[in-house]
Amino acid sequence: MKILVALVLALALATASCSPATEPTRSVATPGEWLEFEGSWNAAGNRRTIPLGGDRRGSIINLKGTMLLAGPGRPGTGFRSEVIALVDSAAGLLGRSVWTDERGDQVFSELTGEGTAAKNHITGTILGGTGRYAGVTGSYDFSWRFVIEAEDGSIQGSALGLKGRVRLGQQSAGGTRP
């Protein structure tokens, strides 16, 4: 009898240990609740620069890449990202960004920052979105590090310390998040 009980327990443990792990459940956001996220952002594109006297330069940058977000408050997991920005080496950066998820739903944001090699802290203000991101608001910040800056204007880089928070709109608050 003891052998039979031990055999049943061993079989139950073996079965439980071989079953797939389940992802922790996430609560659905309530309207007005702030959700925090962090992530990585890598992009490549081009930059056109003009001299503005002395060491000052003006640039237009166009970047496309991928953004992956983590954390229980992330608005989505993966996005295609696009950025256009005007950078003045003395005055900073002003730009716009669009994140597009796998469904085609988008998040729009305004980028502002120091935008210089010595001080490159950038802040994004989420202005809204489409589909499940309709009515979304929030902010995020990061520092940008260029990995490639070629003479022909080709650039490639990544965000360091990307963190933010979002408040989902009424329409998207009751929906599901990936």
Region locations from a protein language model:
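C-terminal motif of bacterial Sec signal peptides marking the signal peptidase cleavage site
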Residues: 14-17
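Sec-dependent signal peptide recognition
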Residues: 2-8
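Beta-strand-enriched cores of mature, soluble protein domains
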Residues: 20-178
